[in-house]
């Protein structure tokens, strides 16, 4: 029989192969369509239809390297080696029964502090998500580091019904994700790995974005999702670094991630629709294959267009807080210790609180401004922040990007973005570097006496309240809440309850 040596089309050779390694974006999109995992929108985005997404429980194997280092709580539950082995072996066997997609990626842009990871996925679209949110290197693992391995199996039936599991084994450098969970858990699990390892090297992992000016000055914007980080960091003549996670060490800032995951609703309504290569999870298409901008849809894409992988020491640090109480000023000055306290508190509006202030206002305290992938005690990261601020001689400010003049939904109005932009411009020009102002002792803040380009009536938050006494009462209540929250993180103590809940 004559052998057929003619070249095979990509789609033809897939018929005889079950393992696909390091496919590029177009190939993964093609595979996702062939496997009916999703469909293309009119603009070319890969749209994955809505599917059940259950709660995800993250476990970490309790072994010598983690026993006393992890802040054991509801977000980081301990499990045994036997439980990990059972899930790993089950998922490994499950994946070998069908086609699987492998990608060799890095977590972290830094040539010294990256970690290499082999990601094995059950679906093409999850592999595409991994390529977008992590870093496909030009050369994999050039320093020949010990490799991490991640298995991802959404249809594995060993997970609790309607839920998902993530288990991390630091000593073996392995992660396993099983069950119907949002794709973002893959990315967050690997950020948790870096966030455990980096502090041992004196590097602070954080959720933020940096901008670099034409003269090389660096500004770091830290805040919870929805606080306006990207909106305020972007500007004429400034390049961006980071979209999801950053590492801050002695040599400056570097990307931990290579892409961005955002709600579809967060994209400009009049901007270009997501195009080819963009992944839309929980998306729906109309008869014309146009995307429905639903609240559940999330898009993932690489951020090559940011143009920068690293930045030097930040000259200015801006902590962004969406204050639902309308108590905080639009801008205040912090020193390193007070900045660490505000970072520890992570005070802001609860997720989903409407910009218009509709509904009952609600606050939350999320250490690190809600970076759910920080597995150590929040005090570890706060102390690192204070050290980095001191070593870099950075100027620190807190900006209220929430409400002023009253609580959200009860007389308060959103801080105009024009006001926030004017404040950022003044900070970047160095107009507030002197640090002079009026102390607001109960909130551990200093009010600047003037901000160029900003009406002075905005500087004192009490000015916008109809009843000054109501503002004083609200400020006292916030100060007490901040104090009670910080009391959980006394220096040298773990912020978690001592009791451990096992898997």
Where are these regions (language model features)?
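Conserved glycine(s) of the Walker
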Residues: 228-229
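Generic C-terminus detector
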Residues: 458, 463-503
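Gly-rich Lys/Arg/Thr-decorated short loops/hinges at beta-loop-alpha junctions or inter-strand turns
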Residues: 69-72, 169-175, 363-368
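Short coil/turn segments at secondary-structure boundaries
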Residues: 102-107, 203-205, 398-401, 436-440, ...
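N-terminal accessory targeting/assembly segments
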Residues: 1-141
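Short histidine-centered catalytic/ligand-binding loop motif
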Residues: 73-80, 176-182, 372
């Amino acid at each position: 029989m004559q052998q057929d040596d003619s070249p095979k089309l990509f789609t033809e050779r897939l018929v005889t192969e079950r393992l696909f390694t390091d496919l590029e974006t177009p190939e993964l999109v093609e595979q996702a369509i062939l496997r009916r995992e999703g469909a293309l929108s009119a603009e070319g985005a890969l749209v994955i239809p809505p599917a059940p997404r259950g709660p995800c429980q993250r476990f970490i194997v309790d072994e010598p390297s983690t026993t006393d280092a992890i802040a054991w709580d509801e977000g980081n539950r301990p499990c045994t080696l036997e439980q990990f082995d059972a899930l790993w072996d089950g998922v490994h066997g499950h994946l070998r029964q069908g086609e699987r997609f492998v990608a060799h990626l890095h977590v972290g842009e830094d040539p010294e502090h990256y970690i290499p990871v082999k990601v094995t996925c059950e679906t093409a679209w999850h592999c595409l998500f991994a390529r977008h949110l992590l870093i496909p290197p030009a050369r994999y693992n050039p320093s020949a580091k010990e490799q991490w391995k991640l298995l991802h199996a959404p249809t594995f039936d060993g997970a609790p019904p309607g839920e998902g599991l993530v288990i991390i084994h630091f000593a073996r450098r392995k992660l396993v994700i099983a069950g119907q969970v949002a794709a973002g858990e893959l990315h967050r699990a690997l950020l948790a790995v870096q966030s455990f390892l980096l502090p041992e090297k004196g590097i602070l992992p954080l959720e933020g974005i940096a901008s670099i000016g034409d003269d090389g000055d660096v500004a770091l914007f830290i805040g919870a999702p929805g606080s306006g980080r990207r909106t305020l960091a972007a500007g004429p003549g400034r390049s961006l670094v980071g979209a999801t996670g950053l590492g801050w060490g002695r040599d400056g800032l570097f990307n931990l991630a290579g892409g961005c995951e955002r709600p579809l609703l967060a994209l400009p309504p009049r901007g270009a629709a997501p195009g080819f290569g963009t992944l839309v999870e929980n998306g729906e298409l109309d008869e014309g294959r146009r995307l429905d901008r639903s609240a559940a849809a999330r898009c993932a894409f690489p951020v090559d267009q940011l143009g920068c992988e690293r930045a030097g020491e930040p000259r200015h640090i801006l902590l962004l807080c969406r204050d639902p109480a309308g108590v905080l000023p639009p801008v205040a000055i912090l020193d390193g210790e007070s900045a660490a306290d505000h970072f520890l508190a992570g005070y802001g509006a609860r997720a989903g609180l409407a910009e218009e202030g509709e509904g009952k206002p609600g606050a939350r305290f999320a250490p690190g401004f809600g970076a759910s992938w920080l597995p150590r005690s929040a005090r570890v990261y706060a102390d690192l922040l204070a050290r980095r601020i001191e070593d870099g001689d950075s100027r620190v400010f807190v900006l209220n990007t929430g409400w002023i003049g009253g609580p959200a939904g009860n007389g308060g109005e959103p801080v105009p973005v024009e006001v926030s932009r004017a404040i950022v411009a003044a900070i970047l020009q160095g107009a507030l570097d002197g640090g002079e102002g009026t102390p607001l002792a109960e909130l551990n803040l200093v009010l600047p006496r003037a901000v160029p380009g900003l009406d002075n009536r905005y500087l004192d938050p009490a000015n916008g309240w109809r009843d000054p006494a109501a503002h004083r009462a609200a400020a006292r209540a916030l100060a007490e809440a901040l104090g009670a929250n910080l009391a959980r993180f006394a220096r040298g103590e773990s912020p978690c309850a001592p009791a451990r809940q096992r898997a």
